[in-house]
């Protein structure tokens, strides 16, 4: 048959022209060659260490609200005046974080989709750029809502808190995210249409403050019986039950601060002493944080009430204010101050500045 003839012909050609094998077949040789090639390539951790060693010892890590990541000298930082109060205008984007690079800080980026990843900021010394360049590709298209510095020492009483838009709050042991690889990791299971609204480092025994757009505020103790620690696949318990049309704005973990700053869409600012708020249980009604005097004005954002706070408006104007300069009001009172906004301009966000060893 033709098949037998072709086989005999190929076998004759192999015996006539083929060269004898000069290497020895080794079981698993393909895997060994791949491992050897990988070891010869510089890995990400080695490149990160080399980039860190090339940075000046007195450098400062600067991350702005628009996502720009830079390593600058103290002299350049002083000329920018980005850590000083300023009125609304054509100012640079507010600073979100200013930290010394010695000791090297560990930064955790949390996305709206409930994923976390380490920020490889060390590469910003030679090539500054947008935050996306220093994050794994797994976060591409998933907006980062928070950047949290991880502690250097004991973190047994610390946890990562995630507040979702449906009013659920989940605490994850911080030890589970300290040693992240170069990939993004999912830390919360979200239903369709639900996103992470706020993320924060929580300390056991402190308080959590949540607020909605109508001004309803809820203060919860961060304890295992009220806000238990959960695994990565859990959604977290319901904390604030929302009325029809009511939306959750955000939350603040009160660790080293005792006051909160609240801003409305029309630019009204109120600072409240958090110790005056009563502690509640999950699902409670809570109390009214401020009295909104206009029907179309709603709570836009909340942040800690001390230190420097950046301001961003709908017309892309920027400013910086000193939260400590605002007097504290009692819960339920009108906001004490008004930002100088243009016609048809609204407040978009408040960006608290994290610097040095602030929490």
Give each language-model segment a name.
Residues 1-359:
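Short, structured "edge-of-domain" segments at secondary-structure transitions
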């Amino acid at each position: 048959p033709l098949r037998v003839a072709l086989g005999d012909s190929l076998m004759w050609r192999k015996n006539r022209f083929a060269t004898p094998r000069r290497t020895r077949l080794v079981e698993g040789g393909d895997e060994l060659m791949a491992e050897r090639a990988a070891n010869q390539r510089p890995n990400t951790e080695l490149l990160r260490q080399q980039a860190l060693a090339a940075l000046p010892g007195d450098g400062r890590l600067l991350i702005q609200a628009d996502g720009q990541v830079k390593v600058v000298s103290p002299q350049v930082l002083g000329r920018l005046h980005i850590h000083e109060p300023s009125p609304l205008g054509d100012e640079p984007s507010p600073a979100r974080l200013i930290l010394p690079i010695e000791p090297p800080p560990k930064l955790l980026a949390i996305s709206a989709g409930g994923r976390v990843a380490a920020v490889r900021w060390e590469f910003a010394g030679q090539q500054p750029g947008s935050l996306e360049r220093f994050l794994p590709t797994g976060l591409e298209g998933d907006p980062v809502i928070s950047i949290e510095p991880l502690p250097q020492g004991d973190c047994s009483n610390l946890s990562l808190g995630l507040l979702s838009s449906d009013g659920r709050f989940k605490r994850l042991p911080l030890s589970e995210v300290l040693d992240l690889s170069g990939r993004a990791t999912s830390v919360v299971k979200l239903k369709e249409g639900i996103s992470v609204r706020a993320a924060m480092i929580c300390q056991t025994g402190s308080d959590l403050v949540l607020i909605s757009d109508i001004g309803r505020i809820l203060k919860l103790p961060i304890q295992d019986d009220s806000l238990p620690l959960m695994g990565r696949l859990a959604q977290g318990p319901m904390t604030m039950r929302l009325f029809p049309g009511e939306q959750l704005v955000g939350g603040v973990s009160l660790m080293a601060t005792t006051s909160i700053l609240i801003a409305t869409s029309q630019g009204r600012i109120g600072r409240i002493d958090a110790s005056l708020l009563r502690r509640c249980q999950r699902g409670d009604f809570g109390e009214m944080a401020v009295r909104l005097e206009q029907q179309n004005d709603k709570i836009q954002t909340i942040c800690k009430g001390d230190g420097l706070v950046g301001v961003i408006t709908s017309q892309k104007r920027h400013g910086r204010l000193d939260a400590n300069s605002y007097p504290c009001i009692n819960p339920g009172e009108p906001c004490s101050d008004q930002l100088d906004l243009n016609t048809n301009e609204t407040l978009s966000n408040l960006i608290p500045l994290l610097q040095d060893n602030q929490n």
